[in-house]
A protein has these predicted regions:
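C-terminal structural segments of small proteins and small subunits
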Residues: 39, 43-71
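Amphipathic, hydrophobic secondary-structure cores in small proteins
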Residues: 1, 10, 26-43
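Absolute protein N-terminus
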Residues: 1-2, 71
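Short amphipathic alpha-helix segments
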Residues: 9-25
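Preference for short coil/turn "hinge" residues that link or interrupt alpha-helices
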Residues: 23-25, 29, 56-58
Length: 71
């Protein structure tokens, strides 16, 4: 199952992706799914089993994540 992290800015999405990949996590930039938001924007998709690591990196790097979702 994949999870999605959403962001208010493109900069935060790209910074999140780079930070996660730098420690070997499988993260990819994706459009925000319509069921989450009708607005345009970027999100990051990652395996749900990495949820704890992903949240830890976001907190450590002070990355502003709008929300986390399970798909």
């Amino acid at each position: 199952m994949d999870c999605i992290a959403t962001f208010d800015t493109t900069h935060m999405a790209l910074f999140f992706e780079k930070s996660c990949r730098s420690v070997g996590l499988k993260v990819k930039i994706v459009p925000v799914p319509r069921e989450i938001s009708s607005s345009c924007g970027l999100a990051c998709s990652y395996p749900c089993e990495d949820e704890e690591k992903v949240r830890s990196i976001a907190a450590e790097k002070v990355i502003e994540v709008s929300d986390y979702h399970r798909l």
